[in-house]
Design a protein with these regions (language model features):
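Short active-site neighborhood of thiol/selenol oxidoreductases, capturing the structured segment around
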Residues: 59-75
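N-terminal post-signal-peptidase region of extra-cytosolic proteins
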Residues: 51-56, 79-82, 115-121
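Thiol-based oxidoreductase modules, predominantly thioredoxin-like and allied folds used
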Residues: 94-117
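Typically the conserved alpha-helix immediately C-terminal to a functionally engaged Cys/Sec
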Residues: 79-92
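Non-globular targeting/processing and membrane-anchoring segments
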Residues: 3, 8-61, 138, 145-175
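Extracytoplasmic/secreted cell-surface and envelope-processing proteins
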Residues: 78-79, 106-108, 144-146
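The canonical Cys-X-X-Cys-His
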Residues: 75-79, 134
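Structural micro-motif
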Residues: 120-136
Length: 175
């Protein structure tokens, strides 16, 4: 029974890695820094560390990362996913910056900002526009990493965060 669970977990992780690799484009998204919103500074006072242990044992400071959410107020998948994301942000202490494609927020993120065209070009150069879509943005370098398109549950989202941060660490030579 345990062997079957481990085998199925490995298959899920492999498909997750394949999906992330399709989203991750070294000539596009991964190497192109996101631009801060007009009137904001990329550098602010550094928050206290919020350590998150990855499944490979490595620790990552979630204070170095921000989740950027692209959503729509009338999207049923956003209504399903956004409360999950908000709860995870509160639980793990990461911050979420929400953009709306239709000018409307939802109950989880009622004050989402309308997305400017240049932000759309930065985040969606080679992937389809869909909602919800999330990216991890390194607050120190403004490097944006594609995270997920579509709704998922809490465990699925955190597993994706784990996988993306492991892949990022491997590409950067971190241990």
């Amino acid at each position: 029974m345990l062997f079957t669970l481990l085998l199925s977990a490995a298959a899920v992780q492999a498909s997750t890695r394949d999906e992330i690799e399709r989203l991750w484009n070294p000539q596009g998204m991964a190497t192109q820094p996101a631009q801060p919103a007009a009137g904001t500074s990329a550098r602010t006072a550094k928050p206290a560390p919020r350590w998150f242990r990855l499944s490979n044992g490595r620790q990552v400071n979630l204070a170095d990362w921000k989740v950027v959410l692209f959503m729509q107020g009338h999207c049923p998948y956003c209504h399903q996913f956004d409360p999950v994301l908000k709860q995870l942000a509160q639980q793990y202490g990461f911050s979420v910056f929400s953009y709306t494609l239709d000018g409307q927020g939802d109950t989880a993120f009622p004050e989402a900002l309308p997305v400017p065209p240049d932000v759309m070009q930065t985040f969606f150069p080679n992937i389809p526009v869909a909602t919800p879509t999330t990216f991890l943005v390194n607050v120190n370098t403004l490097e944006a990493l594609p995270l997920l398109q579509g709704a998922t549950d809490a465990a699925g989202f955190m597993a994706r965060v784990d996988t993306v941060l492991q892949m990022y660490g491997g590409k950067k030579g971190a241990k």
